[in-house]
Amino acid sequence: MFEIKAKDNRGRVGVLKTNSGDVKTPNLMPVIHPRKQTIDVKKYGADIVITNAYLIYKDEDLKKKAAEIGLHKLINFDGPIMTDSGSFQLSVYGDVDITNKEVIEFQELIKTDIGTSLDIPTAPFVTREKAEADLEVTLERAKEAVDYRNSQNMEMKLNSVVQGSTFPDLRRKCADELTKLDADLYPIGAVVPLMESYHYKELVDVVMNSVAHLPDSKPRHLMGAGHPMIFALAVAMGCDLFDSAAYILYAEDDRLLSVRGTYKLENLQEMPCSCEVCCNYTPDDLRAMPKEKRRDLIAQHNLNVSFAELRLIRQAIYEGSLMELVEERCRAHPNLLEALRQLGNYSKDLEKYDPRSKKSAFFYTGSESLYRSEVLRHIQKLRAMPRKRDLVILPPSRKPYSKYVSSKLGNFYVYGSEQELDLNNTDFMVLDIPFGLIPLEIDEIYPLSQNESPRTWDVSSLEFIEDFISEFVEYYDQVLIHSNVIKKLDIGLYNIHSQSDEIRYAKDDLKKVKAIADYQFGVGAGDALFAGNIKIEKSKKTGKIRHIYDGKTLIVNMRASDSFLILSKEGAKRLHAATQYPKNRVVVNKDSEPFSLEGKSVFAKFVVECDEDIRAKDEVLIVNEEDKLLAYGKALLGACEINDFQTGQAIKTRKGMKK
C-alpha cells in the first residue's frame, strides 16, 4: 500500500496506493466542500482530496446522491478521496448525531478511498484528566472501526487518528495502541490550534512523539496543516500528507499564502510569486474585482504556491538537501526557528532514518546545523575509533585536507606535559566546522569533505569546537595544537613543543583505506579487508583511490563521489568472516535464499532481522538464518524501516554468492 522511493532525514518520497490510483508523497489534500466548491483543484496539481463525510450525511439531498452515484461523481473528482468523519464538527459544536459505526458504514457506502473513525479531537493545553478521558474514547472508536471494517470486508482504507493533546506521553501511548490495530494511515490530530497560535515548538513535540511510535510502513497525515511555511519542517519530522482548507478560507479573507508567511492583499504593492495569477494580475487588479472572482484567483495562487513548495520538498529529498531547505524555511518566523531548535533535541531519533551518503553537500547555515544527524553520527563514530598515544590538531584548510596538508606545518603548543615525538603513534586531525575533529586518514569520506561553512565562526560554533577539544584532549597522553588554532580560539597555552619543526604528516594509502573501512563498517574491518599483498589503484586523472586488490583479486572499489568502499565478492567474504552476527547483516528467510544467491534484490517482506545500525545507503551483507553469506548489496532503507515494511525493496543486491 505504501512504498518509500527516496529518503532524507525522516522525510520520504513515497507512493500511496489506493483503489482510485497512486499518490506521490509528500502531498497536499485540498479540502473540497461538497456544495460550495468553485475551483477545480486537480487543475492546480491535486492528486488526492479530502471532504467531509458528515456534512454529506447531514444533507439529505447530498446523502441520497452520494449513495446513488458515489462520492467521486458527487464532487467531480476521479482520483483518491479521503473523508473526515465529523470530528471537526465534534470539536467545534461538542456533539454530532452519528455513531462511529454509522459513519464508517456511510463512508464505505459512498465509496470513499480512505475513511476515518470518529475520534475525539482534544485541544492543546487541556487538563490531563480530560486528555486521558478523550483518548480512551478515541482508542475505543478506532478499534471498533478497524474491527467493523474488517468484519464487513470493506474495500476502503482506514485512518486511525493519534490524539493526546499536548502531553507527549499520551501521544506516545495513543500511537502505540493504534499501531496494534494495523490501520492503513495514521493522521496526527488536534494540531490546528497550535499552528494558528504559532506554538510550533509544541507542535514538534506532538509530532515527534507521535511519529516515533507509529509504524514506518504506513503514511502519516498532519491534520489541518495547510500553510506552505510549515510543510518542510513537517516532512522532516516524518509527515507524508497534509490537508488544506486554508487555500480557500484565506482567499475569502483576501490573504495570500507564501513560504514566508501570509500577505494581506490590502498591503501588497507587488505580487509575491511567479505563479500564473501573480504574473497576470497586479494587487490593484485584484482589489478592483468582484469578491467572488478575486477569491477564486487568490485561492488559485494559494494552491499554486502550496504545490510548488511540495515539489521543491520532494526534489530536496531526492538530492539530500531537505534539512538545508528546512533551516531556510524556519527562518521565516522566530517561532519556527524555535521549533527547529526543538527538533535538534530529537537528533538521535532522526539519525536512525538519515542516509549515510547523499547527492548534496552538507551546508552549515547556522547553529542549528550542529544538531543534524550527520554531525551526531560523526561524533559517535569518532568516539569509537581506536586512538594512538598523541594527537596533533591542525587548522582548517582547503578540502580534502589530507591532499593539501603542508610539508611545513608550523608551531605547535603542548597540552599536558611535553613528551618526545612519536609520529607513528600520533593521530592527525583537522579542527573545523561543522564536524569538529576530522582525522586526516578519513577526511574524504562523506560528508567530512563534502560540506561548506562560513570561514567566520559564530558563537555557537566556537562553543561547539571548545567542547569538542575539551572532550578529546582527555583521550591522549600528549596533544599538540597548531598556533593558528590557539590564536583563533584564544586558548591559554604558552609552551611550544621543542620538536615542532619535526612534525610532519606522512600520507599512507594503506592506513587510509583501513581507517575508512573501520569508520564505515566498524573497528577491525580495515585489518580484515586489507590483509595480504595489497595493491591500490588510483585514477590517473584525479589521483583518487579507485580499486584495492589482494594481488589480482579485487577486494573493494572506492566510490569517487563520497569515498565509500563498495564491496566485491572477496570483500564481502572477508567482512563476513571477520564480523560477528548480526553486524552489517540483513537476514532473509528460506523463501528468499535462492533468489539472493542469484543476485536478485531483497524485498522487505523476506527479511527476518537486520543489524539495528544499518542506515539507508549502507553496504550490507545478505545472509540466511544460519549466517551463511548469500549476497551483498546496498540498503535502500534503514534498519527500522526494513524490519517494519512488508512491501517494496529493502536491499539492492550487487551480486549473489552462487558459484
Swiss-Prot record:
Q: Where does substrate bind?
A: 119, 190
Q: In which pathway does it act?
A: tRNA modification; archaeosine-tRNA biosynthesis
- One MF term in GO for this entry? RNA binding
EC main group: transferase
List the cofactors.
Zn(2+)
- GO BP terms, alphabetized: tRNA wobble guanine modification
Q: What does this protein do?
A: Exchanges the guanine residue with 7-cyano-7-deazaguanine (preQ0) at position 15 in the dihydrouridine loop (D-loop) of archaeal tRNAs.
For this protein, the record's NCBIfam families field holds: arcsn_tRNA_tgt, tgt_general, unchar_dom_2
Q: What is this protein called?
A: tRNA-guanine(15) transglycosylase
What does the record give as the organism's lineage? Archaea, Methanobacteriati, Methanobacteriota, Methanomada group, Methanobacteria
